[in-house]
Amino acid sequence: MRFTPRKAGALLLALAVVTVALTASVASARPARSGASIQACALLPDTKSSTRYTLFDAPYLKAAFKAGGISAQVLNAQGSSSRQKSQAEGCLAKGAKVILLDPFTTAAGLAITAEAVSRGAKVIDYDRLVPKSKVSYYVSFDNVGVGKLQANGLIAALKAKGTYGSKPVIAELNGGITDNNGHLFKQGYDSVLSPLYKSGALKKATAGDQWTDWDPVKGRTIFDQMLARNSNKIQGVLAANDGLAGAVIASLKAHALKPIPLTGQDATPTGVQFILAGWQSGTVYKAIKPQANAAAQVAIDIIKGKPVKTNGKVSGTPSILLKPIWLTKANYKRVFTDKFLKKSDVCIGEYAKYCK
């Protein structure tokens, strides 16, 4: 048979079809992958208790993992323990060898840590330590120190207002009762305030020491009730974070009351605005980028088999502890120079006039 160019082309086409068919057959015989494998996961708790997790932690962690050449996911539980557990399961199923965990609740943290360790993964507690767990490392701020800063900031504000010497009535809006950090903050501020209550220099408001679950809506309801129980005569508030401080401010305004010494935490844009406007005395500024970078570096070192450098221990856990700062009108620009916040985040609308 004569082998013409036309016949050659037909033969090549036929061979190509057979090759594609065989390739497809082999490919379909292979087990499907459940998803791309990853080396690490960062699990954040929610968006309700603070805006920091979406504004700062998530992007900083993603950038740090990328810079370290680590494949990782950063996930938020959106205030659900069951969702956070499912996220952890998904990460482990994809091969994650390190879980960087900021637990929504201590119970969730214990369950996630136990599961991760049983599957050969290391757990780094991020911002919140899970007590009595098999965590490998802890990266956070000195949280007892945070509480002390808040208490001393409240006292300084009372003195500046001239009410410290008149046995002012103080209310405390604590964070989450199931959150170990909430207890550490309280340990810190109670170490300063309790002796003053005992000596009579300060007076704790009636029903004036309550837990809020870090929920500003719940905090508002509780503070409304505190005002009612104390005939609107509360002269200072230790609010555990900026969200709760905002709830206090909303309540004061609703009752046509003037600003009183009031603390916060997290240096949120709204918190800084309230400081500039005179409604909030100060906030604890925790530079999140160094914290995120430090935590990501621990994960990177573990994955690459390098030694992890720590600077302390908390409850026996090797830890990296960073130093918080008390932020007021006097030093609020620090958040701009550190690029923690943009001036355009704070100095806008009715608050623009307060920025110098």
List where the protein language model places each region.
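A residue-level marker of the well-folded mature domains of exported/periplasmic proteins
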Residues: 2-6, 10, 27-356
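Bacterial N-terminal signal peptides
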Residues: 12-21
